Regions:
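Short, solvent-exposed loop/turn positions at domain surfaces
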Residues: 42, 48, 65-68, 272
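Short histidine-centered loop motifs in beta-beta connectors
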Residues: 43-53, 57
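Short beta-strand and beta-hairpin "edge-sheet" elements
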Residues: 79-80
Length: 448
């Protein structure tokens, strides 16, 4: 019987433009790009040059500090450009795709015949090891770590997030194979929604399955780790996106690196919200072309709370499960501002009268609606943070640079995304996710 854990802290933000369960196909796409910044914590070293021909699965760059960690091209084709920014930082590696795709053959494997070292070696060789993250530090993991557990959250609850039950349809065999492969390395814990009707997810082999019920961010893998396997200093837990599990399963079953994923195209400024199959590194222009309303819009590579601001010139992120388009809001003109009833506006603390109209989908824009101010100790964070940590005190310790206090308050167990809802409700308008990222990076440097 599946264990059920119910959380009560959090906030569900209902936004207009949720993707309907309709999947469309992209037209012909010729240009792709892999972005090193998608793999937090690595130092990229490019191993190809312009004009080189690569197969799908060949490395485009490696982690300079761990050269055995490769990052594979999503397509076969000609390396078109290595785009660099300030101080020669690698921004992306562009590949012009062949008309007919060729894959590097790593050979299909019987997962039952592999041990943990065999799985590690295969993932390193094929360029999929970098898709595994770790706690502490919420970074792409390294081969010198030994996890005490591996966590996979097989559902999503961020605003406008896609339904993983729908995304995984037809790929259940690959998902199970990926879970079995990871179980060769450490105990695998899979979180699913209590509402999930997918029998494969509910009856997974080689994993401990836990059903979760509660408001956002109950789906965050950091919440699962905090409840089931707290991370102490010196310990490591791996976290794997459910789509990366499918990538691993495909590699074992076919011998190919196939980075195709089903993403939600959502938001109030999307004409027809839907799902689409796209490779990692697909141009956002190809995904959104002809499906965005006119006017000033914010294109987000990811969900509205944790995604990054992007443009039509951007590329689908390595861990991105949705592309969102919402109003920018810079052309809004509201008479009398906050003093108006604002029946069409969302408020977490019922500052507006919209709550009288019952549950509904809101059309929110990208405005912060307020300036930065001193941190207010109001208990707001704790109301939406379903973890056994003192969120406000942890943020204060990060701002103060007090590493000892950060360790005592549980920084090893958190990722920036765990503070996404707290950032949304924060009266101080602080960029909490950026602060947590800064604190984790500082702590990592201190402990290296």
């Amino acid at each position: 019987m599946i264990n059920l854990i119910e959380t009560h802290k959090g906030l569900d933000i209902q936004l207009a433009g949720k993707a309907s369960e309709k999947k469309t196909k992209l037209g012909v796409v010729s240009d792709y790009a892999l972005v090193p910044d998608d793999f937090t914590g690595i130092v990229p070293k490019v191993v190809v040059k312009e004009g080189d021909h690569v197969l799908a699965g060949d490395p485009l760059f490696v982690n300079k500090n761990f050269p055995e960690v490769r990052f594979a091209s999503p397509v076969s084709g000609i390396v078109e450009a290595v785009v660099r920014g300030d101080r020669r930082k690698v921004l992306c590696v562009k590949v012009k795709a062949d008309d007919s795709q060729e894959y590097r053959d790593f050979g299909s494997k019987n997962v039952d015949s592999l041990d943990g070292n065999g799985v590690r070696s295969l993932l390193l060789e094929a360029g999929l090891f970098g898709y595994i993250n770790q706690l502490p530090y919420a970074v792409s993991t390294t081969p010198d770590t030994t996890p005490k557990a591996i966590f996979v959250s097989a559902f999503r609850d961020m605003p406008l997030a896609g339904d993983f039950d729908f995304e995984v349809k037809g790929q259940e065999v690959d998902f199970q194979t990926g879970i079995t492969a990871l179980s060769k390395i450490a105990q695998v814990n899979v979180g699913i929604s209590s509402k999930s009707q997918n029998e494969t997810l509910r009856n997974l082999k080689d994993a401990t399955v836990t059903a979760w019920q509660g408001p956002c961010p109950a789906a965050n893998v950091g919440v699962h780790v905090n409840h089931l396997c707290p991370v102490n200093k010196g310990e490591v837990v791996w976290t794997v996106d459910p789509v990366a599990v499918i990538f691993i399963g495909r590699l074992l079953n076919t011998g190919k690196v196939d980075l195709r994923r089903t993403i939600a195209v959502a938001g109030s400024e999307v004409v027809e919200p839907h799902y689409v199959d796209a490779l990692v590194g697909t141009p956002l222009k190809a995904i959104l072309e002809g499906n965005v309303r006119e006017g000033a819009v914010r294109i987000i590579n990811g969900n509205p709370l944790t995604g990054r601001k992007d443009s039509l010139d951007g590329y689908l992120g390595a861990h991105t499960s949705e592309v969102t388009v919402i109003p920018e809001g810079d052309d809004a003109d509201e008479m009398l501002g906050w003093i108006m009833p604002r029946l069409g506006h969302f408020s977490a603390n019922r500052s507006y009268f919209s709550w009288l109209l019952g549950k509904r989908d809101y059309k929110l824009d990208a405005r912060v609606k307020g300036g930065k101010r001193n941190m207010i100790m109001s208990g707001e964070y704790d109301k939406v943070l379903p973890m056994d940590i003192y969120g406000e005190y942890l943020i204060k310790a990060i701002i103060a640079g007090d590493i000892d206090k950060q360790e005592q308050l549980g920084i090893y167990e958190v990722a920036p995304e765990d503070f996404a809802v707290a950032e949304f409700v924060d009266s101080s308008k602080l960029e909490l996710q950026s602060l947590v990222r800064k604190g984790l990076d500082t702590l990592r440097k201190e402990n290296m």
